[in-house]
């Protein structure tokens, strides 16, 4: 076995996916692994680099397709990917990198605001050695929240925003609103 594998961190908005991604990448950095992080370039809410909702920043390459950064990451053994649901080539890229012996850590929304699978991110589950589904706190009743609820009436899937546009909600609050 070449040591390559895929770790998938999924959950709703505000569940700490990016924070967990950064924690895992930092852990490998401490162990002297050569690490790189990639973020979706259309997510420019807070500036350059990878940002968490609580304003923690981490250096990251930016791309709209992962294949565009292939040449830049050949020397790295750990690849962190934030907002994985937005990359159209996420499944093929992760499988290729893991097969080449790299550790790939992906943070992604598992469902849309309509509680549908988010693009093809769920296709990574059978290819992953480790899958963690995080929960948030329901912003209405303060129970465990597994879903992201959009506050506006827009119907397109890819609308990037924070707590001005989305809430994490439990099942009951999702259905009631």
UniProtKB/Swiss-Prot annotation:
Residues noted as binding substrate in the record, renumbered to the chain: 113, 157-161
Assembly and interaction partners: Homotetramer. Two molecules of substrate bind to each enzyme tetramer.
Enzyme Commission no: 2.7.1.21
Active site: 83
Keyword Transferase: yes
Source organism per UniProt: Vaccinia virus (strain Western Reserve) (VACV)
Keyword check for Metal-binding: yes
Name by which UniProt lists this protein: Thymidine kinase
Residues given in the record as Zn(2+) binding sites: 138, 141, 170, 173
Sequence similarity: Belongs to the thymidine kinase family.
Top EC category: transferase
